[in-house]
Amino acid sequence: MTLKTALQYFGRDFEFPNSIAGLPDKLSDVEGLEIGSFKTNDGVSLSYWKAGKGIPLVFVPGWSSNGAEYINLIHILKQDYEVYVLDQRNHGLSDKVTFGNRISRFSADLNDFFTALDIEKAHLCGWSMGCSVIWSYIDLYGDQKIEKLAFIDEAPSIYCHSDWTEEERIKSGAFTISAEAMISMYYGKGPSNRLAVNTDIHDFYTVVGAPAFENSHSLYEQFVPPDMAALELVLFDHIMNDWRDIFLYKIKRPTLVVSGEHSNWVESQRWIAETVPDGKALIFAKNENGDHFLHLKEPLKFSSQLKAFLQA
């Protein structure tokens, strides 16, 4: 296991394009930021971003994301927590491999992360596919190491079965009838339509009107650009999972479910919060950048709400 300061790792500082009160102006403003790595039990080197002291708060990013996009959240939350952001296999600074590209293996990686860093208890916060990784982790390893849970805008089932009622589709958040069509749309490989893939998520993947997201995304593009070929390998498995039973039978910890009025599956987020034993829904309004990228666009508001939940 290795650990370097962020400036040692990247070899230089980085200045963000926008100066925003309460957020870093440059990478070196995130005091104590370190980049570490560890080996999984199948020999893959995974990286993580770390700063702060206190109860561990572990972020599991969504598909294609990594610690660079979380730089603002790290800066804010390190005042109260030992903050970690895990770069999953084929993501960010972690190894790019052609094996183990399924959600169950990603959750095993999360378990290996807890073991390697000797973390006995932590808050867990997942976003998008990162939620699925946590759901799989709970399914396979239980919740003994979890204090509280937070989930950001992930549908319980992306894939819609042809024999589901409309009520089932809405509660599951399903928005595609073809994993292949969804992957093709994500990669711009061919035409799509609302029947095959019903989402406008890409319309909101923009830094326009979101200077905080422009800052974190600029670090992401400069230092940790995505390997799109490697990222594609996990998508089919990710799309085809149905996690609804996890909320019905497995999750017992206090749970915050965060979404926005722009989300195509916001009703499924309300369903999760209503279904788990101790759940709470937090819905960002449209004028609060209430879309799939809300925590990156509004890091100050999101961090404040997350802290209030964790400290309650």
Give the location of each predicted region:
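Flexible "cap/lid" loop of the alpha/beta hydrolase fold
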Residues: 146-188
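Alpha/beta-hydrolase fold catalytic core
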Residues: 1-57, 80-81, 119-120, 147, ...
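Conserved HGGG/HGGXW glycine-rich cap/lid loop of the alpha/beta-hydrolase fold
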Residues: 44-96
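Conserved hydrolase catalytic core segment
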Residues: 120-163
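Catalytic active-site module of serine/aspartate enzymes centered on a nucleophile-bearing elbow/loop
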Residues: 279-312
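Active-site loop/oxyanion-hole signature of alpha/beta-hydrolase fold enzymes
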Residues: 41, 49, 85-129, 140, ...
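Alpha/beta-hydrolase active-site loop signature
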Residues: 64, 88-92, 131, 156, ...
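Conserved serine/cysteine hydrolase catalytic core
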Residues: 223-274
